[in-house]
Amino acid sequence: MSPERRPVEIRPATAADMAAVCDIVNHYIETSTVNFRTEPQTPQEWIDDLERLQDRYPWLVAEVEGVVAGIAYAGPWKARNAYDWTVESTVYVSHRHQRLGLGSTLYTHLLKSMEAQGFKSVVAVIGLPNDPSVRLHEALGYTARGTLRAAGYKHGGWHDVGFWQRDFELPAPPRPVRPVTQI
């Protein structure tokens, strides 16, 4: 039996959301290997990242009945200028709100935003094994590109990292990426 579908609001993330986001992600940091951090984050770390990145990269949250239940966001892939049209995407859904379709809903909105902004390529880095994340990314058009074996050590074992990529059609040479506020 699947969980009951409830109304979901997808909206830009704000600093006020970051405590809830921090709780969501810290659950995975503490209990799994889907995130390779080993120490919990603070809400202020999330606020700092949001404020540093939100003009160029979309950061979205999903609310279910007024509660922040997930986040999808993008950030730079690499610091070199030639990578300006490539981003890294990330999504987390609260363990309390699984199987409601929030991951795909958040990601669909995030991908539309990134395409409208003029990004060319989106990379997802997935700690393996993580079959639900692999299925989600592949259902959204990402293609497996490679695996780094034993890339991280956490919870008593070595874990691989997989790279998935999705491309958008853009002209060459590309135009400058538009800020989030201009889409």
UniProtKB/Swiss-Prot annotation:
Its EC number is 2.3.1.183. Keywords: Acyltransferase, Antibiotic resistance, Genetically modified food, Herbicide resistance, Transferase. One of its GO terms (molecular function) is phosphinothricin N-acetyltransferase activity. PANTHER family: N-ACETYLTRANSFERASE (PTHR43072), UPF0039 PROTEIN C11D3.02C (PTHR43072:SF23). It holds the Pfam family Acetyltransf_1. It is an enzyme of class 2 (transferase). Residues 8-169 form the N-acetyltransferase domain. Introduced by genetic manipulation and expressed in glufosinate-tolerant canola and maize by Agrevo. InterPro entries: Acyl_CoA_acyltransferase (IPR016181), GNAT_dom (IPR000182). Gene3D superfamilies: 3.40.630.30. It catalyses: phosphinothricin + acetyl-CoA = N-acetylphosphinothricin + CoA + H(+). Inactivates phosphinothricin (PPT) by transfer of an acetyl group from acetyl CoA. This enzyme is an effector of phosphinothricin tripeptide (PTT or bialaphos) resistance. Belongs to the acetyltransferase family. PAT/BAR subfamily. GO terms for biological process: response to antibiotic; response to herbicide. It comes from the Bacteria. Coiled coil: none annotated. Acetyl-CoA binds at residues 91-93, 99-104, 130. Disulfide bonds: none annotated. This is Phosphinothricin N-acetyltransferase.
